[in-house]
Amino acid sequence: SEIMEYMVKYTPAEGGVMLQTEDEISACTMAIGAAYAGARAFTATAGPGLSLMAEAIGLAEMTETPLVVIDTQRGGPSTGLPTKHEQSDLMAAIYNTHGDTAKIVISPSSIEESFYDTFEAFNLAEEYQCPVIVLSDLQLSLGKQSVTSLDYGKLQVRRGKLVKDGLPEIKSPEYFKRYDLEAEGSISMRVLPGTPNGISLGTGLEHDEVGRPSENRAMRTAQSDKRLRKVRSVVDTFESPLYEDAPYPQSDLLIIGMAGTRAVISEVAEELREKGLRVNHVQIRLLSPFPVCALNHYLQEAKKIVVVEHNATAQLARLIKMNVPPCPELHSILKYNGDIFYKEELLAKCKEVL
């Protein structure tokens, strides 16, 4: 609601539009339609809304349409704890569509990162032509904090392979290869509706290179591989997949978190260092595709590893184990009663592991 209220206040003055739709399904599909027509569009929700948006997010994946979804996690399932803190949407954000997923999931861990990463989400969505989910939580999205400064000069709009009239790619009156299998980096040219000679189709069905529905087995395999392959390359281009407060080449304790746990983990890490322990702390900012190489170095050089998260099923720890084989032993510190972690509480839990 706070995002909506902010957009109502400021978007019209910048030439933008804010719509409050009848439900989350409409919100997501309208954002997809706006993006398909060339606008930068997003929708914001919480866990239940993300569940409703699942099929529409899959449509954006299949049509390779840019889409940004902001999910402020809360207690679930169902209505759950609508005004309390939790981090239980991680797996839902990555795998919430049926079929093989081809999306990007990022999770800022501070006010500054929220500002820069949300802007970057729009660049990623257009460059990789896929949905980008920004995963936040109540503590981070509703917390109030003063920051030193935000550098607007760092915000550079990148629209990716957006074809405009006059380029040689669209001089032919033939159907435009919107889903070109030989495109560099598996990212094909994107043409907006109404562009002369840029005729292509957009459908949720599997399709050939111009968008015509196709059940050809070889085409199905090739298009599926194309969608998955292009997203995997984000690992190599995302500027900082981890927040790293890690001064030690080898550590006695590595603490891993995501989203709003950064502040309390930082306090705990600092106190343990004052006691002579070598403590490294990282927050995972790029959750999908997973930054295996960036994280694995810290995992292999730590005597003990704890993963701090707000859910009952250790979703972040499970995600690490899924992507980093063989994975060292992980100790999960979990809290899922609707409240945040407090310093003394988390400090005591970390000492138990040590």
Identify the meaning behind each predicted range:
Residues 32-35, 39-42, 115-127:
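Active-site-proximal alpha-helical scaffold in enzymes
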Residues 80-83, 115, 146:
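C-terminal structured domain segments across diverse proteins
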